[in-house]
Amino acid sequence: MTKPAVVTLVLCLALAASAPAQLPDLTGLWGATLRFGPDIHGTLLIYRTPDGWRADIAGFTVPVRGNAPPFAFELPDGKGSFRNGHWIQPGGVASPVTLVADGGGPNRWRGTVTPLENRLTFYLPITRDLHTYLRNPERNAGTFTRVSRIEVNGKDVRLIGPRDTVRGHYEDGVITLPLRGGTYDLTRVSDSATSPFYPRGNPPARYRYTPPLQLDDGWPVATLEDVGISRPAIEQFVQLILDMSMDSLNTLQIHSLLIARHGKLVLEEYFHGFDRNQPHNLRSASKSWTATLIGAAMQAGVPLRLDTPVYQTMLGTVPADLDPRKRAMTLEHLLTMTAGFNCDEDDTTSANEDVMDNRGIEDWWGYTLKVPLVSTPGEKIFYCSTEPHLAGMMLAKVARESQLDLFERLLARPMRMRNYYLGLRDDDAYGGGGWAFTSRDFMKMAQLMVNNGRWNGKQLVSEDWVRRSTAPLRNLNAVQQYGFLWNSAEYDYNGRKIRAYFAGGNGGQVSMGIPELDLVVAFTGGNYNDSVLFTGQRVYVPRYILPAVQ
């Protein structure tokens, strides 16, 4: 080899060695899911032995208290407990368990424990110019970690946003990122065309209306045409949902859409991988269940009244030095969020739900009673989630029965709701939010109100309670009013105003009744902590649903 050839070869090798490594092509959809438990589930057996009652579940055998249902027991290491027909899973969530005689007469009982799954999924859609964002269906955690692009340097990966940077690494087709709850190994979604990241496929098939299934859950079904709703208009609306581009963190995420009229379910559609058997977190829409439960308890004879004093009821005696304004506080003030506590969910300096949670407060109702007042009860409305919780605890105190048992007895059984979960505080249902129901059961709440408190011929809640609960008693904001833990609003319809009331929760949870049209609409969604969550009730109902109703 000649000397010039050698020099040329050396230069080529040097240039090759100094050239940057080729960046991997990350274009496409990436995703990962972490499951956090709970691990106890399956068949529960409770049986009598010569030494007393025992319970078997998931490999554990423990002693049982009680000689007949209701039984009670605890698993070791806080893995769960059972009391009065409810399974209490770690983290404080209760779900009903039906015990049936298991062939051994009264000495053997069988049930099934189905805890609420705790899992988080993150999607990372990456464009050719390396723009991206984090999509999290369960909690919308991307709103707290706002990123807009991805950078790769060798094995180092950075997700970069205006304020946040997430550092991870890439190797062998895996993007590893530390995100909420743990470390996620995101892989390319192999069949992104059918991924739950999209409403229903990418691109979606042309939507054709199909009536809901008739199930043994108390819902009669019919077609849109049967109840005077335009099928073409609703088909066009559902197609709009299916065609939504998922190119932004703020894109609307609708998980379900249901419509009923004249007491019959006529539309039932699910998106983003959700289905009719999957309970959905209702967030603050649970508050309306709390008001409904209190009304049902009054209807059943529990001696609780709107003018029942809060402090006398909860403490037994009123301290001599108690603020006179607190002495005058009643159940009605809690139900209308006019108690006057220094508690506002929009004020991080107040004693609101997030502050109490972050401080690790265990005695929520006791802590709330000690919060100072900033106004006289009945004077101003402050959106405070611990006030409905305190109202629920008043109910339990007066009834001498837990809200868990009251809800199961007074509402769940007569309304045929079997698959639900109630978040707990103070060892009882948390009236401020976090309950989970299937969409069909969630919708029953508004239908019960439209029925003036009747379900399947039985008066569960008085007509007077329905009227007061759904009345526009206070202005919550410029476009919504508030009753007894129920929102209300007005819509234009055929040249006139009609009134609607609804249970509403963060993320886009809506169970709405429009009594003048004998119409009920329900949405569930995943736009937590994002203003687009109001799109269902503020845009879709007046623009697409009401014009379809004849």
Please describe what each predicted stretch is:
Residues 263, 281-307, 334, 391-395, ...:
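Active-site SXXK
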Residues 419, 467-522:
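Active-site Gly/Thr loop motif
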Residues 309-315, 321-415, 439-453:
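Active-site-adjacent helix/loop patches that line small-molecule binding or acyl-intermediate pockets
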Residues 7-16:
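Bacterial N-terminal signal peptides
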Residues 291, 387-394, 433-455, 509-526:
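Active-site-proximal alpha-helical segments within enzyme catalytic domains
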Residues 22-32, 41-45, 94-275, 302-304, ...:
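N-terminal leader/targeting segments and the immediately adjacent pre-domain N-terminus
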